[in-house]
Amino acid sequence: ETLMSDRPGRDPRWPKKRSGFAAFALTEPDAGSDAGACRTTADKTPDGSEYILNGRKCFITNACYADFMCVVASVDRSLGYKGLTMFLVDAHLPGVSIGKHEDKMGIRQSATCDVIFEDVHIPASALIGKEGEGFKIAMKTLEQGRASVGSACVGIMRAILEEAAKYA
């Protein structure tokens, strides 16, 4: 169902996932591969019912098509990576916008874009896992995704070799 849903199969946040398009928003312009340097913030409202999301993500695959995004943001920047938290964010909420589209050399069948969050109100129920678990969740997600990319590359290379052998 998901890597870190705390209520798999019963979680009311996830039905849309089955028919919508998703994006994983971790990388930032000033953080690069250092996820712990995340500057996107999620400030909890005084009554605790919402978080206000502000920041910018870059190199986000298929962000311009996404119906929702798994977004990593800091709830406490003084904690570094231990303050990172993941949220399920509706990509059509007010304050969510798509920025620059990258002109890539390879893997051009998927779009890669910036995503800007400006005072985006998200419900506290949008939390994936718990506050402070965002770094762990993101790393597990990347671990699984990287294995999939490696597998896909092996399959692509096999097909290339088979096609090349036809002409040899």
Can you annotate each of these PLM segments?
Residues 50-98:
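A short core secondary-structure module
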Residues 40-43:
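A structural signal for short hydrophobic beta-strand segments in well-ordered beta-sheet cores
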Residues 34-36, 62-66, 80-83, 108-110, ...:
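Short glycine/proline-enriched turns and hinge-like loops at secondary-structure junctions
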Residues 1-10, 61-68, 80, 147, ...:
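Internal helix-loop-helix
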Residues 1-28, 46-51:
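FAD-binding glycine-rich core of flavoenzymes that anchor FAD
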Residues 22, 36-38, 67, 94, ...:
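Short beta-strand or tight-loop elements
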